[in-house]
Amino acid sequence: MGMTRQAMDARIDEHFGFEARDDVDGVLATLSPDVEHDIVGWPTGPARGHDATRPFYEALFSDLSDGKVQTLRRYYGDDFVVDESLWQGRAPGRPFGIEGRDRPLQFRLLHVFEFAPNGDIRRENVWIDMAAILQQRSHG
């Protein structure tokens, strides 16, 4: 028997909450110790485990600020959720290798979260609307 929708939502919302507070340790606490963390297109490729995943979040939190995630849709399976969200905030650094110049930024994300039996996120796969980011960076 898989997790309930409410339990999956609570874990994802907790994960996004730690991200909004730039809390690397909090984010990692929502992930299983052997997590597969796959940000599609990230230069170093998929990471496995907390130690390999930490650098992504450290870079992300220095490159983006004042972030808010708005959930648009969620689709559920027994032990997974597909989450479509909209991220809005500022880009003081170089998010995803693109100069941010501390301007406002918004882009859609598609997450596939898979859960371990204990409720930890055992796989996080993220697809980012890079075209939207590039378009916003090329104007202004």
Regions found by a protein language model. Give the residues of each.
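Generic hydrophobic alpha-helical segments
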Residues: 14-15
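A solvent-exposed, acidic/Ser-Thr-rich amphipathic alpha-helical stretch
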Residues: 5-10, 24-78, 86
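Short beta-strand edge/turn micro-motifs at domain boundaries
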Residues: 82, 104-135
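Basic/polar N-terminal segments that are highly enriched at the extreme N-terminus
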Residues: 1-10, 138-140
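Short, surface-exposed loop/helix-turn segments at secondary-structure junctions
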Residues: 92-102
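A short local loop/turn or secondary-structure capping micro-motif enriched for an aromatic residue
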Residues: 46, 91-92, 130-134
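Generic short beta-strand segments
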Residues: 84-93
